[in-house]
Amino acid sequence: MSSTALAVKGVEISFETTTLAFDCAVPAKRIVAVAGASGSGKSTLFNIIAGFEQPGRGEVRILGEEMTGRAPAERPVSIIFQEHNLFAHLDVATNVGFGISPALRLDAANRTKVEDALARVGLAGFGKRLPPTLSGGERQRVALARAFVRHRPILLLDEPFAALDPGMRAEMRALISDLHEEEGNTILMITHHPDDVRALADSVLFLDRGRIVAHDEVDRFLGRRDIAAINRFLGNEG
């Protein structure tokens, strides 16, 4: 297995008025915060990695394998969005079961895996509940359970805590840290909060105007004063 989990090389994608360009390499088994102002290209980078958008040039390699031409379902990637992760009309266990089999062909062993996954995220006994009856934090825990039953080596978290209060954010950060330690996967997490960087990340990819302008270990990133956009993110201005 490659020691580099993710390599984005010479990737460019053009929209009507702008071209975004990305280059980065992420070591395996790390938690990487992906930060930057709204519109800096964070979600576009995730969409390219996951296969939802195709770049005009460049390549994406995951664990050394080139991803060009692979559909999202064929990539070793799970993604959790800020919201809309679950099917509201299906119970929690069924939502998690989709992570094992999209056709929901689950034998007894797989149903046990679903129950175990829910227990791991603190939702034992929630299998028959419907998503609309859950809190925002509980719904994100269900999405995490589904991601982890897939056992994909790359997990993309697109602002997973955005709708949560500070206490729930801290609980979710701790849960993700614990699950990451168990799984040994590589996590990229979009965030607008320096506290998420300090509490959870090993390193930071920082984007500004469609470019990755910094890729630093956390301590170095938190000490930077040379890039205005980073100063704004960290609240160092004024």
UniProtKB/Swiss-Prot annotation:
It holds the Pfam family ABC_tran. Its main location: membrane. Its EC number is 7.6.2.15. Residues 1-234 form the ABC transporter domain. It comes from the Bacteria. Keywords: ATP-binding, Cell inner membrane, Cell membrane, Membrane, Nucleotide-binding, Translocase, Transport. It catalyses: thiamine(out) + ATP + H2O = thiamine(in) + ADP + phosphate + H(+). GO terms for molecular function: ABC-type thiamine transporter activity; ATP binding; ATP hydrolysis activity. The keyword Magnesium does not apply. It is a peripheral membrane protein. Gene3D superfamilies: P-loop containing nucleotide triphosphate hydrolases. GO terms for cellular component: plasma membrane. It is found in: Cell inner membrane. ATP binds at G36, A37, S38, G39, S40, G41, K42, S43. The complex is composed of two ATP-binding proteins (ThiQ), two transmembrane proteins (ThiP) and a solute-binding protein (ThiB). PANTHER family: SPERMIDINE/PUTRESCINE IMPORT ATP-BINDING PROTEIN POTA (PTHR42781), THIAMINE IMPORT ATP-BINDING PROTEIN THIQ (PTHR42781:SF1). Belongs to the ABC transporter superfamily. Thiamine importer (TC 3.A.1.19.1) family. Part of the ABC transporter complex ThiBPQ involved in thiamine import. Responsible for energy coupling to the transport system. This is Thiamine import ATP-binding protein ThiQ. It comes from Rhizobium meliloti (strain 1021). The gene is thiQ.
